Amino acid sequence: MGGISSIARLGVKGLKSILQDSVPEAIQKIPTKVKEVAPEVAQKTQRSNTVPTYKKAKELLNKKGKTLDFGAGKGLGAKEIKADTFEPYAKDWKPDYNKSVDIPTESYENITSLNVLNVLQKGDRDQAILEIGRILKPDGTAIISTRGSDVLEAAGTKGDEAMSIITSTGTYQKGFTPDELVGYTQDLLGPGYVVEKVSGIGKAAIKIIKVSKKYGGRIMRDPNKNYNEQRAI
């Protein structure tokens, strides 16, 4: 699927640098013991046939504000929805950002990341989600999708995680169920974010809203936001 990125090669040093400048100290303690993936291998997962999926995702985003495609792959989906781009290993085109640390904190009202997380091993995947949370503006919306059990249809060897595989071409794939993706993301981001399932965008997809208002020490939902499960048209 499109939007798949090779950001798995950020590596431990790069991830620590991102964390030191970008996220709270408590989050910096999350382990990042992951193997680096050569970009020429991870780039094999990039696809150019997912423009319709981007159109569906756009229906769930805020109508106003800037959009960032996080892990833009070939950049075709971002072009369709007029989004800025983050892609560390772009080939034959120039993204707006090739290092996530260069993206300002709380700078985008909307973020898409379609079928990116499923090609990342857990340490890098955790950091990608934390970066999306950091970059998202208060009341901003992020749409994330991943593959599901279909990843196991590829030839390869079983990975360390549930529903994961190392393919015969050397790429990593981790499938999610919708409920698993919600729980994993919510636990990682914490109570400052609302994470809900959405349907119509791949095997598993979620909508993240960054909560902005606090009253009496309790985080409250914006009454003007619709937090119910939504379906892409």
Language-model features: where?
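Hydrophobic, gly/ala-rich membrane-insertion helices/peptides used by toxins and envelope proteins
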Residues: 1-35
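Class I (Rossmann-like) S-adenosyl-L-methionine-dependent methyltransferase catalytic domain
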Residues: 30, 34-103, 141-213
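A conserved beta-strand element that flanks and buttresses the S-adenosyl-L-methionine
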Residues: 112-115
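A short glycine-rich, Lys/Arg-flanked "PGG" loop and its adjoining helix->strand segment in the class I
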Residues: 126-141
